[in-house]
Regions:
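Intrinsically disordered, low-complexity mixed-charge segments
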Residues: 751-768
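Ordered, soluble secondary-structure elements with a strong preference for glycine-centered loop motifs
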Residues: 298, 727-731
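Short amphipathic alpha-helical signal-transduction/dimerization elements
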Residues: 597, 641, 738-749
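Short helix-capping/linker segments at secondary-structure and domain boundaries
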Residues: 267-274, 450, 598-603, 749
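Solvent-exposed, polar/charged alpha-helical surfaces in well-ordered, non-transmembrane soluble domains
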Residues: 72, 81, 136-140, 144, ...
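Beta-lactam-recognizing serine transpeptidase/beta-lactamase-like catalytic domain environment
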Residues: 315-336, 343-347, 369-434, 439-723, ...
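Membrane-proximal periplasmic segments of bacterial cell-envelope enzymes
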Residues: 1-332, 356-384, 390, 403, ...
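Surface-exposed helix-capping loop/turn segments at secondary-structure junctions
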Residues: 361-370, 647-651, 748-752
C-alpha cells in the first residue's frame, strides 16, 4: 500500500516536471517571439500598428486661374458638389449586409446563434432580392436627382469596380503566397460617379444618404468655368462696305471666345498621367500633386490648360488623425499658379464677331468675284485675324472662325468644309503670297544683295523667251498687256513696286538672293520653328511638338539640294512673291511685320505674359534691317493703302463705284494685300464620310499691315487677316482688316478722342479718278 502511494507520488512529480518543462519551453518560445516583435522587427510592426490607428483624408486643391491682360478671368475653379457611391454598393456588399441584418432580425438573436451556417445563408438568400431592390431604388433616385441616365450611373460604377479589382489583383500578385490580404483603401471608400451637381441636388442627396447610410455621399469638389465661353458683341454696320452698309448696329453672338487658346479640362485620369506623375511613387511615398484614378481630378486636355498643366496644377492637402489620441496632423493644399495672357478678351471677342459670316464680310459677296473660278454668293468662308503690339510682341487678339462651338450651327457639309475648332490663326498654314514682298526686299538689302534705292524695270514677264510664265499680274489681256514701267515711265522704286505689287521687281530680288538666301531669310523671319509664344507651354523648341502652334513650311536642306540638282530657278523666283514651297500662319505673318517695324529687332510674339512661364529658348538679337530699307518699305506699304493706285486702296463695285477700303479717322494704316494660290477646296457634301466634292483654282485672301495714330512716329500694331478661299486680298481681307482697326479704336488701343469722334459715323460714296487709265488693283497677284 505504501509502495503504491509512493509510485503515485512519483508519477505526479514527473507529470509536474514535464508540464514545467513544457511551460518553460512555451515561455522561451514566447520570449523569443516577443524579442523579435519588439527588438528585431519592432520598428516595422510599430509602424504597421500605428498606420492602422491613422485615418487619412485628402483635401482638394485649386487649379490656377487663366487671366487676360486686363485681369479678366478666362478660366477658374469654383466650388461644386460631387456625388460618390460607396464601394460596398458597387461590389454588392451593401445589399448582402443589408439582407444579413434583416435575416438576423427575423430569426432573433437566440435562434440565429443556434442555427447552422447553411441555414443562415438560406435565410439571407431569401432576404437578398428585397435588399437589392431597395438599393436599386436608391440608385434610381440618385440618377433622377442628378439628371443622368441610370445606364450612365451603372457604367460609371462598373468602371470603378474594374479599376479597383485591377488594384486588388496587383496587390495579390505582390503579396507573399498564402498570406491573407486586407481590404485596400479603395474597397473601403466612396468613389465619385457624378461631378458638379447644384446645391439643391446636393441637399436632396444628403437626405437620401441619411435614410440609407453607406450608399451615397456628397463630397466637396470644384469645377472649371470659363466666364468668356460666349459673348454678345454689338458691331456698327455703318462702317461696312457700301453694299453691306445699313443703319444702326447688329449684335453678333460669339460662342467659344478664346476656346481654341484657353482649351479645356477633363475629369478622367489617363494612364499617361499616372506614368508621368504618379500619386504614389515606386518607393511608396506620396506626391500630393500626382495623379490617381481614385481621387477626383481636373486635368488640362487642350489649349493652354494642357500646355501649362504643371503650372496651373496645385497640390492636394491631407488630414491625418490618430484614433488613439485624436491628434490631427493637417497639410494645407497648395493652389496652382495663375497664368496671365497678353490677349485682351474684349478685343478678342470683337474680332471674332467681325470674322463671323453673320456680319457679312466673310461670306462670298458679288464684288469679291475674281480668279479662275468663284464660289456661290453667300458661301461662308473660314478666316483668322491676329493683332500684335509692335513694341512688346504681345498678342492682343488671336481669332479664328469657326470655333468648335460655332460648329453646332453649321450643316454637316459646312462642318466638313470649314473644319470648326481649328485655330487657323496659329495652327493652319497658308501660302503667304504677295504679303512677303516688303520682307523679301528688306532681307535682300540686309544681306547686301540689293541697294535700298534699287530701281527695277517691269517688263510684264520675267523670262524674255517665255511671255506666259513668271508674269506680272498687269501683263494680261484684261489690262491691255501693259507693264508697270510703262505706266510710271521707267524702272520702279521699291515704294512703287510695293504699292503696285509688281511681281517682276520681287522675282529679280529673289534671283539676286539665290535659293539659299531666300530660304535662310524666311527662317530668320521665324519659319521652320515655332515662335515660343506660350501656346505650346514653357518647353524648349525640341520638346514642343506640333500641337498649338505651327512652325510653317520652308524647304529643308534635302529639298534645297534637290532643287539645286535640277537647276530649278523658277522655284527661287516665285519664293520671292510668297509662292512655291513656303507657307506660314497668320501669327507668323503678323510677327514678321512687327519685326520689320522694329527694324529687325527680334521680339517674337507671345501669348503668355509671365516671362517665367515662357520657353527658355525664345529668340533674341536683331536681323539688322538697314534703317533706309525699313523706311522705304514702310513708305511703300503706306502708298499701297493711301495712293489711288495702291492694291489696298479701294474696292470697285459692279456699278463702277470705287470706295476706299480704309476709312478710320485719325488712324494711319500701312499694309500689303496678298492673293495666294490655294490648294483645292474639298469637302464631304452628302455626309457619307468621303470628301467627293472639289473646287480648284481658288485663292486665299491676305491683308497684313501696320497701324498707328496719325500723330505717332512709329507703328504701334501689326495686323494680319486671312480669309480662306476669299479670292482678292484687297476686296476680301482688306475690309476685314479695316474692321479690326476699327475694333482697336473702339477698345481704346488707338486714340480715345478719335474713338469718340468716330462713333456712329457713316460713309458716303467715294469715287476716284482712274489716273490716266491705270488699271484697278489686281484680282490675282500670282504668276501662272
Amino acid at each position: 500500500m505504501v509502495a503504491t502511494a509512493n509510485a503515485a507520488a512519483l508519477r505526479a512529480r514527473r507529470r509536474l516536471g514535464f508540464l514545467a518543462v513544457v511551460a518553460m519551453g512555451a515561455v522561451a518560445v514566447l520570449s523569443v517571439r516577443l524579442w523579435a516583435l519588439t527588438v528585431w522587427q519592432g520598428e516595422h510592426y510599430l509602424e504597421k500598428a500605428e498606420s492602422r490607428l491613422d485615418t487619412a483624408d485628402w483635401l482638394p486643391t485649386i487649379r490656377g486661374r487663366i487671366l487676360d491682360r486686363q485681369g479678366r478671368v478666362l478660366a477658374e475653379d469654383v466650388p461644386a458638389w460631387d456625388v460618390a457611391i460607396h464601394y460596398k454598393v458597387i461590389d454588392g456588399t451593401w445589399a448582402r449586409e443589408r439582407a444579413q441584418r434583416a435575416a438576423r432580425s427575423s430569426l432573433g438573436r437566440s435562434l440565429w446563434a443556434r442555427v447552422t451556417r447553411d441555414a443562415r445563408q438560406g435565410v439571407i438568400s431569401l432576404r437578398l432580392p428585397e435588399a437589392e431592390a431597395e438599393l436599386s431604388g436608391v440608385l434610381d433616385e440618385v440618377a433622377r436627382l442628378c439628371e443622368v441616365p441610370r445606364e450612365q450611373l451603372d457604367s460609371e460604377m462598373a468602371r470603378v469596380r474594374e479599376r479597383v479589382e485591377r488594384l486588388v489583383e496587383r496587390r495579390r500578385a505582390q503579396a507573399e503566397e498564402g498570406k491573407r490580404l486586407k481590404p485596400i483603401s479603395e474597397q473601403q471608400s466612396s468613389h465619385v460617379v457624378v461631378r458638379h451637381v447644384p446645391d439643391a441636388v446636393a441637399f436632396a442627396l444628403r437626405k437620401l444618404a441619411d435614410e440609407f447610410p453607406g450608399t451615397v455621399e456628397v463630397v466637396d469638389g470644384t469645377r472649371r468655368v470659363h466666364p468668356w465661353s460666349a459673348a454678345d458683341v454689338r458691331l456698327d454696320t455703318s462702317t461696312l462696305p457700301m453694299p453691306l452698309r445699313r443703319g444702326g448696329s447688329v449684335t453678333v453672338h460669339v460662342p467659344g471666345v478664346l476656346d481654341s487658346v484657353v482649351g479645356e479640362v477633363r475629369d478622367a485620369v489617363w494612364a499617361e498621367d499616372k506614368q508621368r506623375r504618379p500619386f504614389v511613387r515606386d518607393d511608396g511615398s506620396v506626391d500630393l500633386g500626382g495623379y490617381s484614378e481614385s481621387i477626383p481630378d481636373s486635368i488640362g486636355s487642350s489649349g493652354l490648360e494642357a500646355a501649362y498643366e504643371d503650372w496651373l496644377r496645385g497640390q492636394r492637402g491631407q488630414v491625418r488623425q490618430r484614433r488613439d489620441t485624436e491628434e490631427v496632423e493637417r497639410t494645407e493644399p497648395v493652389p496652382g499658379k495663375d497664368l496671365r495672357l497678353t490677349i485682351d478678351a474684349e478685343l478678342q471677342a470683337r474680332v471674332q464677331a467681325i470674322l463671323n459670316p453673320r456680319f457679312g464680310l466673310t461670306r462670298v459677296q458679288p464684288w469679291q468675284h475674281g480668279g479662275k473660278e468663284t464660289l456661290p454668293d453667300g458661301t461662308k468662308l473660314a478666316s483668322a485675324a491676329v493683332v500684335i503690339e509692335v513694341e512688346t510682341g504681345d498678342v492682343l487678339a488671336l481669332a479664328s472662325w469657326p470655333s468648335r462651338d460655332d460648329g453646332a450651327e453649321l450643316t454637316p457639309a459646312e462642318r466638313s468644309r470649314l473644319q470648326p475648332g481649328l485655330n487657323r490663326a496659329a495652327e493652319a498654314v497658308y501660302p503667304p503670297g504677295s504679303i512677303v514682298k516688303p520682307l523679301i526686299y528688306a532681307g535682300a538689302v540686309a544681306a547686301g544683295r540689293l541697294s535700298a534705292a534699287a530701281a527695277i524695270a517691269c517688263n510684264g514677264h520675267f523670262y524674255p523667251e517665255f511671255k506666259d510664265r513668271a508674269r506680272c499680274w498687269i501683263w494680261r489681256p484684261e489690262h491691255g498687256m501693259t507693264t508697270h514701267s510703262a505706266i510710271v515711265d521707267g524702272p520702279l522704286s521699291i515704294e512703287a513696286a510695293l504699292s503696285r505689287s509688281c511681281n517682276i521687281y520681287f522675282f529679280s530680288v529673289a534671283q539676286k538672293m539665290g535659293l539659299r538666301g531666300v530660304v535662310d531669310w524666311y527662317r530668320e523671319l521665324g519659319l521652320g520653328r515655332t515662335l515660343g509664344t506660350g501656346l505650346q507651354g514653357p518647353q524648349p523648341a525640341d520638346r514642343r511638338g506640333d500641337a498649338g502652334e505651327s512652325a510653317g513650311i520652308v524647304p529643308n536642306e534635302e529639298d534645297m539640294k534637290k532643287l539645286e540638282s535640277r537647276r530649278d530657278a523658277f522655284t527661287t523666283i516665285i519664293l520671292g512673291i510668297g509662292q512655291g514651297p513656303v507657307a506660314w500662319t497668320p501669327l507668323q505673318a503678323a510677327n514678321a511685320f512687327a519685326t520689320l517695324a522694329r527694324g529687325g529687332l527680334l521680339l517674337d510674339a507671345r501669348v503668355v505674359r509671365d516671362d517665367a512661364a515662357l520657353p527658355p529658348d525664345r529668340r533674341t538679337g536683331s536681323l539688322e534691317i538697314p534703317a533706309e530699307a525699313r523706311r522705304r518699305a514702310l513708305e511703300g506699304l503706306r502708298q499701297a493703302v493711301e495712293a489711288t493706285h495702291g492694291t489696298g486702296h479701294h474696292v470697285r463695285y459692279g456699278d463702277g463705284t470705287r470706295e476706299a477700303i480704309f476709312d478710320v479717322p485719325g488712324v494711319r494704316v500701312m499694309g500689303k494685300t496678298g492673293t495666294a494660290q490655294a490648294p483645292p477646296m474639298v469637302w464631304d457634301e452628302d455626309g457619307d464620310g468621303k470628301r467627293e466634292r472639289s473646287i480648284r483654282g481658288l485663292d486665299h485672301a491676305w491683308f497684313t499691315g501696320l497701324v498707328a495714330d496719325r500723330g505717332d512716329s512709329e507703328p504701334r500694331y501689326a495686323v494680319a487677316v486671312l480669309v480662306e478661299y476669299g479670292g482678292s486680298g484687297g476686296k476680301t481681307a482688306g475690309p476685314v482688316a479695316e474692321q479690326v482697326v476699327q475694333a482697336l479704336l473702339d477698345e481704346g488701343y488707338l486714340g480715345a478722342e478719335r474713338a469718340e469722334a468716330s462713333k456712329g459715323r457713316g460713309r458716303t460714296r467715294a469715287r476716284f479718278d482712274k489716273g490716266g487709265g491705270e488699271p484697278d488693283p489686281p484680282e490675282r497677284e500670282d504668276p501662272e
